[in-house]
Amino acid sequence: MITSPPNEQAGSWLGVFALALAAFIFNTTEFVPIGLLSNIGQSFEMTPAQVGLMLTIYAWVVSLMSLPMMLATRNIERRKLLMFVFGLFVVSHVLSAIAPSFAILLVSRVGIAFAHAVFWSVTASLAVRIAPPGKQVQALGLLATGTSLAMVLGIPLGRVLGEALGWRTTFLGIAAIAALVVFLLVRALPLLPSQNSGSLRSLPILFKRPRLMAIYLLTAIVVTAHFTAYSYIEPFTQTVSLLSGEMTTILLLVFGGAGIMGSIIFSLFSDRFPNGLLITAIGTLTLCLLMLLPLSGDAVTLGTLTIIWGMAIMCFGLTLQARVLSLAPDATDVAMALFSGIFNIGIGGGALLGSVVSSHLGVANVGIVGGLLALGGLGLCCYTTHHFGKVRPAAEMQAESK
């Protein structure tokens, strides 16, 4: 039986909650521009497709810097590291709010991306580490709930605030909330010396694990497919579905709420049906993307599709995150830095592909292109599942990594 010091055990769920709140802030700021593309574009006399490239730049900076930043900070005590990360985060948001040009806005987003690169390299492993014994899957689920709430509350409220008071106010609001989160992290987290972070010597070892490499490839394909459509959901709903700004905000709320439902589904079924859950999630996502245009004419039908879509992408992300942690218990931070980097390659690639599709084929076709790409991911998933055989339950693998 694994035991912890009384004070650490008592505060373990509070620590996980604090990390989930931090995840809420980081995911809110990464994706809030999706709901503000038109407003930001008007400020700098740019089209939504042009402004959308800030999503690509942000994501690709994260992807390039996740591993180098993790290695550079691998010996720093984790609570102190999070304080530095949030300091950079807050300062960069203030710069975003006062940016006089799109170029300065991009510079500020790069600063946020550096903070993001470090945060997501260590957070999942920290949540698992401080969770009560036997509650690692639930800890990941709570972390995912913070991510989902960014979709439910952060992005829609950011859009509402941006439309009412300007998009700059949205970034100032995020900075203020982040400053409060810092105090909660200081109170909630125990001292967390760096542990099993790995080093450059870990890379050749990880690259020799074919199941892990397959997970990384699958991540890149499916995340690119998802963000090809999701990055341009605002102009899609307004120009193709002809929804009002208020209905678009509601649709974003629905998507985020579905993500919470997806995290619950993950917690319930990931141990018993790891392969089935992953294949079902990718298959459902593929179908939703392919049906986005055909079902875009009716608001209720589109809302239903959005719910299913949101559940599917959340189940997909959580399942792969859990597998990365279980397949690399000897180098969790390196493995998660690679996962975060590849995930963000997918985000940036999807935003870029969506921009190209919007400019040359029309924004109406982003779902079709994304769906075809997701179909390739489904084929890869089925092949690797057959090739590698049955996956052991997540709880069993996490217990072995202790």
Curated annotation (Swiss-Prot):
Bilayer topology: Multi-pass membrane protein
Upper classification of the organism: Bacteria, Pseudomonadati, Pseudomonadota, Gammaproteobacteria, Pseudomonadales
Name by which UniProt lists this protein: Probable sugar efflux transporter
Localization, UniProt: Cell inner membrane
A Pfam family that the UniProt record links to this protein: MFS_1
Organism, as annotated: Pseudomonas syringae pv. syringae (strain B728a)
Gene (UniProt): sotB
Similarity field: Belongs to the major facilitator superfamily. SotB (TC 2.A.1.2) family.
Gene3D superfamilies, alphabetized: MFS general substrate transporter like domains (1.20.1250.20)
PANTHER family associated with the record: PURINE EFFLUX PUMP PBUE, SUGAR EFFLUX TRANSPORTER
GO molecular-function term, one example from the UniProt record: carbohydrate transmembrane transporter activity
